[in-house]
Amino acid sequence: MPRKVAVYPGSFDPITYGHLDIIDRGLRIFDEIIVAVARNSAKNSLFSIDERVDMIQRVLADNVRARVDTFDGLLVDYVLSQNATVIIRGLRAISDFEYEFQIAQMNRSISQDVETLFMMTSVPFGYLSSSIVKEVSSLNGPIDGLVPPLVREALKDKFSKPR
């Protein structure tokens, strides 16, 4: 029986417990999840691509069924190059759905072989985003329940340096 592989794309700047929840729940459905960090030069990221990959690899170190990679270009092309057939997207609210629906439709128009699976975030993470985490952290607010400890420390380091 062929392995069921899904790609979970994003900027993960930084990875949060909301992202990790989607990965954990996705692994109930798929044999492997590729956490695909987008090389998006249009986004102004706090962490470099290498820093983000390193953090995610360290957070997922004990999970042999999740691996981290980077991609640029069309997501559909990347998914097919990895012998995957599904893109996982987490949805927090209705406002996420409209944008994600349009992207899923575009991806489907490019390749009929790639499906998009929308997963609703678990209730405790319904409001959580990397942007909120960065904003709270930049103001020295508590982010303990939002990100893993190593991410919290990386954020603390970033915001303690003059910018």
Curated annotation (Swiss-Prot):
Its cofactor is Mg(2+). Its EC number is 2.7.7.3. GO terms for molecular function: ATP binding; pantetheine-phosphate adenylyltransferase activity. Its main location: cytoplasm. GO terms for biological process: coenzyme A biosynthetic process. It comes from the Bacteria. ATP binds at S11, F12, H19, G90, L91, R92, E100, F125, G126, Y127, L128, S129, S130, S131. Pfam families: CTP_transf_like. Substrate binds at S11, K43, L75, R89. The keyword Chaperone does not apply. The record marks H19 as: Transition state stabilizer. It catalyses: (R)-4'-phosphopantetheine + ATP + H(+) = 3'-dephospho-CoA + diphosphate. Keywords: ATP-binding, Coenzyme A biosynthesis, Cytoplasm, Magnesium, Nucleotide-binding, Nucleotidyltransferase, Transferase. Transmembrane segments: none annotated. Pathway: Cofactor biosynthesis; coenzyme A biosynthesis; CoA from (R)-pantothenate: step 4/5. One of its GO terms (cellular component) is cytoplasm. It is found in: Cytoplasm. Homohexamer. HAMAP family: PPAT_bact. Reversibly transfers an adenylyl group from ATP to 4'-phosphopantetheine, yielding dephospho-CoA (dPCoA) and pyrophosphate. Belongs to the bacterial CoaD family. This is Phosphopantetheine adenylyltransferase.
